[in-house]
């Protein structure tokens, strides 16, 4: 990788050289933590702290001025929200809108409702923004309406769907009659006779099946949200399912797409899925998560990768760690070998049953399992506050059969490393490189995000340990841990 030192104050400098830790004896006060987002704090979610970035707004009404004060808000009280929703925000430690919420909420809450395509970094409040919009549009004035689906949120995985349900439960805890339903694959295939709830959160295939079987009535839906929209619209199968679900919904439904990344081709697709939408975007150079020390290790071959991981085990358990691999088979093999050698690890892939997946992620959130081996099923949206390290055991890549050169998957890399260093904390991401092709893919990532990824010499494990421990200690000190 590039050997030049980044200029002081540059993006690369901020990422590869996190600030010195705050004194452990001076933990942050609640007032200094305006929000939690991703998972609610009650679920072990992370506090929201924002880096310096600019939110760009493009209005569907080209004659309107996006800088008009009407399209920005500084206080939740200025939005005319139900006092019970404000009470829920207060219970979640929401003191003022995040930067993305300042611009998104006036656009989301306007009447008549307009579509929105929103791009924002992980941990900047996008989950709370679309949940707030949904809660403000619900009519819970009768028992019948409370049991009638009025809002639908689609997520790519059951883990993210369950996390979103938790946010709705906490934010909407003071709304009488709020009923939330989850539409994710059932282990036994058993389904309820009818979805009697006001908000449905689920995965596209299950939702489509429920609507077709009339388990879920869709004709009263007012809002459709796609979280991690780029993943669902770009992924074969999920994109088709999303389109089919939308075709079954009322034509005047408000469509909201939120994600941390929108590649150009997906953005074009999203514009068709949510026509005449207001847009909120960031430049991709601004998307690399600030506060994550990005490192890479040279490994001679696949076996050396595994031995390197074993050597890192003691550091992996300082906080919590996620190890990302390419395939389910790799996850199972690594787990099997590490457990046989006496290490405590867990794995989570799309190949295991839903209830078992739920149990694994719940144990990880609670800290009972500190090292989690997974595929890209957990790369997006999942917020666990204790994660201090992410390992890219395999560099994320776009599979292009017949291609002469392997292509790094920039968006997946961003989402993966975003599982640590969330909301102002300092985290570590380590990528394993075992051949020239993997090194070139990491180089592609560095160029795309205009950042620096630092090489660590695995011949000197004392140095490796010192660098990583110092960064993790910095993260814990910022949280006031002792």
Swiss-Prot record:
This is ATP-dependent RNA helicase dbp5. Coiled coil: none annotated. A motif (Q motif) lies at residues 74-102. It catalyses: ATP + H2O = ADP + phosphate + H(+). GO terms for cellular component: cellular bud tip; cytoplasmic stress granule; nuclear membrane; nuclear pore cytoplasmic filaments. The gene is dbp5. Its EC number is 3.6.4.13. It is a peripheral membrane protein. PANTHER family: ATP-DEPENDENT RNA HELICASE DBP3. Residues 107-280 form the Helicase ATP-binding domain. One of its GO terms (biological process) is poly(A)+ mRNA export from nucleus. The Q motif is unique to and characteristic of the DEAD box family of RNA helicases and controls ATP binding and hydrolysis. The keyword RNA-binding applies. Keywords: ATP-binding, Cytoplasm, Helicase, Hydrolase, Membrane, mRNA transport, Nuclear pore complex, Nucleotide-binding, Nucleus, Protein transport, RNA-binding, Translocation, Transport. ATP binds at residues 120-127.
């Amino acid at each position: 990788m590039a050997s030049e030192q980044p200029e002081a104050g540059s993006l690369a400098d901020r990422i590869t050289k996190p600030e010195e830790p705050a004194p452990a004896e001076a933990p942050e006060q609640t007032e200094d933590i305006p929000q939690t987002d991703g998972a609610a704090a009650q679920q072990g979610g992370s506090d929201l702290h924002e880096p310096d970035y600019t939110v760009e707004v493009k209005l569907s009404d080209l004659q309107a001025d996006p800088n008009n004060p009407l399209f920005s808000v500084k206080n939740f009280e200025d939005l005319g929200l139900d006092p019970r929703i404000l009470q829920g925000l207060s219970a979640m430690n929401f003191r003022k809108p995040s930067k993305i919420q300042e611009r998104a909420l006036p656009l989301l809450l306007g009447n008549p409702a307009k579509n929105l395509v929103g791009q924002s970094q992980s941990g900047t409040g996008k989950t709370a923004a679309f949940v707030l919009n949904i809660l403000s549009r619900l009519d819970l004035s009768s028992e019948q309406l409370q049991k009638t689906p009025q809002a639908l949120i689609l997520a790519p995985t059951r883990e993210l769907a369950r996390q979103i349900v938790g946010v709705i439960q906490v934010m909407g805890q003071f709304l009488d009659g709020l009923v939330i339903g989850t539409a994710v694959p059932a282990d036994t295939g058993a389904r309820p006779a009818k979805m009697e709830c006001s908000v449905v959160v689920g995965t596209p295939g299950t939702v489509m099946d429920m609507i077709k079987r009339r388990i879920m009535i869709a004709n009263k839906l007012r809002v459709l949200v796609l979280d991690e929209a780029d993943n669902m619209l770009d992924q074969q199968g999920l994109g088709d399912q999303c389109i089919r679900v939308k075709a079954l919904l009322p034509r005047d439904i408000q469509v909201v797409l939120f994600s941390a990344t929108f590649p150009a081709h997906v953005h074009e697709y999203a514009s068709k899925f949510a026509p005449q939408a207001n847009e909120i975007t960031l430049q991709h150079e601004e998307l690399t998560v600030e506060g994550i020390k990005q490192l890479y290790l040279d490994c001679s071959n696949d076996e050396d990768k595994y031995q390197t991981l074993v050597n890192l085990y003691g550091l992996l358990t300082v906080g919590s760690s996620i190890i990302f691999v390419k395939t389910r088979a790799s996850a199972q093999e690594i787990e099997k070998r590490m457990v046989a050698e006496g290490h405590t690890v867990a794995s989570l892939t799309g190949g295991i049953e839903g209830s078992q997946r739920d149990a694994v992620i719940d144990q990880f959130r609670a800290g009972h399992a500190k090292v989690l081996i997974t595929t890209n099923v957990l790369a997006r949206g999942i917020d666990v506050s204790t994660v201090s390290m992410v390992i890219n055991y395999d560099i994320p890549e776009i599979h292009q059969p017949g291609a002469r050169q392997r292509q790094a998957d920039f968006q997946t890399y961003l989402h993966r490393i975003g599982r640590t260093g969330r909301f102002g904390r300092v985290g570590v991401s380590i990528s394993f490189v075992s051949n020239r092709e993997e090194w070139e893919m990491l180089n592609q990532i560095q160029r795309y995000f205009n950042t620096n990824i630092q090489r660590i010499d695995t011949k000197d494990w004392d140095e490796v340990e010192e660098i990583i421990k110092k960064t993790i200690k910095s993260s814990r000190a910022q949280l006031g841990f002792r």
